[in-house]
Curated annotation (Swiss-Prot):
This is Dermonecrotic toxin LarSicTox-alphaIII1. It is found in: Secreted. Disulfide bonds join C45-C51, C47-C190. Binds 1 Mg(2+) ion per subunit. Mg(2+) binds at E25, D27, D85. It comes from Loxosceles arizonica (Arizona brown spider). Its cofactor is Mg(2+). It holds the Pfam family GDPD_2. It catalyses: an N-(acyl)-sphingosylphosphocholine = an N-(acyl)-sphingosyl-1,3-cyclic phosphate + choline; an N-(acyl)-sphingosylphosphoethanolamine = an N-(acyl)-sphingosyl-1,3-cyclic phosphate + ethanolamine; a 1-acyl-sn-glycero-3-phosphocholine = a 1-acyl-sn-glycero-2,3-cyclic phosphate + choline; a 1-acyl-sn-glycero-3-phosphoethanolamine = a 1-acyl-sn-glycero-2,3-cyclic phosphate + ethanolamine.
Length: 275
């Protein structure tokens, strides 16, 4: 999976997919009532990027729906995964459940269209704090209550903070999650390349072990050829990037093109491939 990073304005959807992304990451900002209101990152962000691009969350979801609905004029067949980076830093722990309910309602209305010819992409809810595990509960309970429990098949989860993996496992247990787990790790592209992969390798070991809880591992932010090769060498399933074309070129190189291919809609993002 080549995950286009910080796609928060509508024109960036086409831009990143045309450069080679089959997955997109959006930053979702909440107001004080735990309502998701904007796709927006803000400063600081990755080097050489405009941190201030934004859109109203419902509008952005509607555009994502068009981009992932077969038959729509804006449809991109290869766009198969959407990762919502939920910026929950401003909400407290006892609002997390409400935040999850609100995200579910917005997705249900504006992306899934209440199950009536909605967007078909898989969705990952990425949460920065394990303390906010109730967000997952609120999300799942809302889909159930609204009669769309079947859509949970389309949803996966990621705790994106740098927590110990045991702590992450515990949070999933509390959230009632078993499976559909992506684990991320990374470092901003502004910092010189340090070997930041020990935690990635630990996550890959967990994924590859019979009693692991992780299904997929991705690394961010991968913008250079050397970093791409390092991440692939560590065994990741996906990379998040500001430059999808760089990753595409590496995957087309000999030595890589016989080992890797871009994920399509037929590839289940919750299925584990062990090294």
């Amino acid at each position: 999976w080549i995950m286009g990073h910080m796609v928060n304005a509508v024109p960036q959807i086409d831009q990143f997919v045309n450069l080679g992304s089959n997955a997109l990451e959006m930053d979702v900002t909440f107001n004080k009532d735990a309502m998701p209101v904007y796709t927006y990152h803000g400063t600081p962000c990755d080097c050489l990027r405009d941190c201030l691009r934004w859109e109203h969350f419902p509008v952005f979801l509607q555009e994502l729906r068009k981009a992932t609905s077969p038959g729509d004029a804006k449809y991109h067949e290869k766009l198969v995964l959407l990762l919502f980076d939920l910026k929950t830093g401003k909400i407290n722990n006892n609002q997390a459940n409400t935040a999850g309910q609100n995200v579910a309602k917005q997705l249900l209305q504006h992306y899934w269209n209440y199950g009536n010819n909605g967007g078909r992409a898989y969705v990952i809810l990425s949460i920065p704090y394990v303390e906010h595990y109730e967000l997952i509960r609120g999300f799942r309970e809302t889909l159930k209550k609204e009669g769309h429990e079947n859509l949970m098949e389309k949803v996966g989860y990621d705790f994106s903070g740098r927590h110990k993996l045991d702590t992450v496992r515990e949070a999933y247990k509390k959230a009632g999650v078993d499976g559909h787990v992506w684990q991320s790790d990374g470092i901003t592209n502004c910092l010189p390349l340090v070997d930041d992969l020990p935690r990635v390798r630990e996550a890959v070991r967990n994924r590859d072990s019979p009693d692991g809880f992780i299904n997929k591992v991705y690394y961010w932010t991968v913008d250079k050829v050397a970093t791409t090769k390092k991440a692939l060498g560590a065994g990741v399933d996906g990379v998040m990037t500001n430059h999808p074309d760089v990753i595409v070129n590496v995957l087309n190189e000999s030595g890589y093109n016989d080992k890797y291919r871009l994920a399509t809609y037929d590839d289940n993002p919750w299925e584990t491939f062990r090294n």
